[in-house]
Design a protein with these regions (language model features):
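Bacterial Sec-dependent N-terminal signal peptides
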Residues: 1-9, 18-50, 54, 228
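Edge beta-strand at a domain terminus
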Residues: 35-43, 170-228
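Tryptophan-anchored aromatic micro-motifs
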Residues: 51-73
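Generic short beta-strand segments
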Residues: 59-67, 152-159, 193-204
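Short, cysteine-centered beta-strand-loop-beta hairpins and adjacent loop/turn segments enriched
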Residues: 65-73, 101-116, 198-214
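Acidic, glycine-anchored loop motifs typical of Ca2+
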Residues: 71, 75-81
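Predominantly extracellular/secreted and cell-surface proteins with exposed
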Residues: 90-181
Length: 228
């Protein structure tokens, strides 16, 4: 094989590789953002590059999923509550919106009796709180779709206040979350799964825990797209 043919062959192989990568990175398929795909570890440099591209505002929807019944629960809130803001420089990495209505569904609180002791929590269903995210860490890339990356959520926290008691301090519900998710760098779409791992009722500004909130096994699923 002469030099010209070798050169043409190398060019053809290069274009084939580029084309296959482009095809793999043009998918906009929800199946690429589940946990059935195969993921390969990425370098810290690649993870940092993705992190630096994230700051901005995202909007979409959130629902509660119960793995024991395989049912989804959607909020009846009239407010536009489903958004995520990731900051470039801030003490808290980012904020996810969460409505009281969704929170009640998450913990299935109406069947636990907590609503008898903290009534205000359940009378203002349209009120919102923020899940404060401490950070997310990208760990791997989808081998079937190179646009999709998996990440871990280090920790999140949400508080809902209740001022219905005639006491100097207000009561509140607090839930801690961890979880994981997927991010498509081409479409700027997040899919985030947040699992409560601790929840309790407390008096504001007090460190003593006053009661545990039962964990139901349900978790939050956010599907969000970058808008700015």
């Amino acid at each position: 094989m002469d030099k010209k043919n070798k050169y043409n062959l190398l060019v053809a192989l290069f274009l084939l590789l580029v084309g296959s990568f482009a095809v793999s990175c043009t998918k906009d398929d929800e199946n690429t953002t589940d946990n059935t795909s195969t993921f390969a570890p990425i370098s810290s440099e690649e993870a940092l590059k993705i992190q630096n591209s994230l700051p901005g505002k995202y909007k979409g929807n959130v629902h509660v999923y119960d793995p024991s019944t395989k049912k989804n629960y959607y909020s009846n809130s009239r407010l536009d509550l489903d958004s995520l803001i990731i900051y470039k420089k801030k003490y808290n990495y980012g904020y996810l919106n969460l409505s009281r209505d969704t929170y009640v569904q998450l913990h299935n609180i109406e069947k636990t009796g907590i609503n008898d002791t903290l009534p205000e929590i359940f009378t203002k269903r349209d009120e919102k709180a923020n899940i404060e995210l401490e950070g997310i860490r990208f760990t791997s890339r989808n081998q079937q779709d190179s646009c999709v990356y998996r990440f871990e959520v280090s920790r999140g926290k949400a508080d809902f206040l209740d001022r219905s008691h005639n006491k100097p301090s207000v009561w509140y519900l607090r839930t801690y979350f961890n979880g994981y998710g997927y991010y498509n760098v081409k479409t700027s779409k997040f899919k985030i799964y947040l699992r409560p791992f601790n929840a309790y009722t407390m008096l504001f500004h007090e460190t003593l825990e006053y009661g545990r909130i039962p964990l139901t096994g349900r978790y939050l699923v956010y599907e969000l797209t970058k808008i700015q």
